[in-house]
Curated annotation (Swiss-Prot):
PANTHER family: CASP-LIKE PROTEIN, CASP-LIKE PROTEIN 1U1
Glycosylation sites: N51, N69
Keywords from the named record: Cell membrane, Cell wall biogenesis/degradation, Glycoprotein, Membrane, Transmembrane, Transmembrane helix
Role, per record: Regulates membrane-cell wall junctions and localized cell wall deposition. Required for establishment of the Casparian strip membrane domain (CSD) and the subsequent formation of Casparian strips, a cell wall modification of the root endodermis that determines an apoplastic barrier between the intraorganismal apoplasm and the extraorganismal apoplasm and prevents lateral diffusion.
Family from the record: Belongs to the Casparian strip membrane proteins (CASP) family.
Stated name of the protein: Casparian strip membrane protein 1
Cross-referenced Pfam families: CASP_dom
GO CC, one annotated term: plasma membrane
Major subcellular location class: membrane
NCBIfam families reported for this sequence: A_tha_TIGR01569 (TIGR01569)
InterPro entries: CASP/CASPL (IPR006459), CASP_dom (IPR006702), CASPL (IPR044173)
Organism: Pinus taeda
Length: 190
């Protein structure tokens, strides 16, 4: 009977070692950071290079739409560039977490700053979204007219930058959740 129970135990799959799970989560953290860097920096570059000139009648009578004409767009560029720079500087800590998955001190530091960067990126994207809403739809009560009918490429490029920024917000939220999950698992293992 002992032989039968031993063979039944041999058929059960063994759970993966704890170190592999942690290392896998650390690699996922690193990849999410790379994606978020791409999203934030592409949003900042797309908005920072956004301008369009509309010529009326002659070359001397022109209307310009540039990102720096609106303070919300300036804040958007600064916020996304700041978050992108932070994510770039956090990569060595993420790599260290891959090498030493049991080090919780760096994970606590990353979860704190990741949460701050979620707020910074969200506020920049929200401010620019409010301006884009008025640019697309206007506001008849205040006599603000829609400019996107005339400045199509300006509005399209700004909308693309907003999409990249909101994608970065989602990636940052995933980073915070991943870090919280990793910290919770480390506490449970002790």
């Amino acid at each position: 009977m002992k032989a039968e129970s031993g063979s039944a135990d041999a058929k059960l799959p063994l759970p993966p070692p704890v170190g592999r799970k942690r290392r896998g989560l650390a690699i996922l953290d690193f990849l999410l950071r790379l994606l978020a860097i791409g999203a934030t920096l592409s949003a900042a570059i797309a908005m920072g290079t956004n301008n369009e000139t509309l010529k009326f009648f002659t070359q001397f009578f022109q209307f310009n739409a540039r990102f720096y004409n609106l303070s919300a767009f300036i804040y958007f560029v600064i916020a996304n560039a700041t978050v992108g720079l932070y994510l770039l500087l956090s990569l060595p800590f993420s790599i260290f977490d891959i090498v030493r998955p049991r080090a919780a001190a760096f994970r606590v530091l990353l979860i704190f700053f990741d949460t701050v960067m979620v707020a910074v990126c969200t506020s920049g994207a929200a401010a620019a979204t409010a301006i884009m809403y008025v640019a697309r739809r206007g506001n008849t009560k205040t006599n603000w007219f829609s400019i996107c009918q005339q400045f199509n490429s300006f509005c399209d490029q700004a909308t693309g930058a907003l999409g990249a920024s909101f994608a970065a917000v989602v990636l940052l939220i995933l980073l915070v959740l991943l870090s919280a999950s990793t910290l919770h698992r480390q506490r449970a293992d002790f």
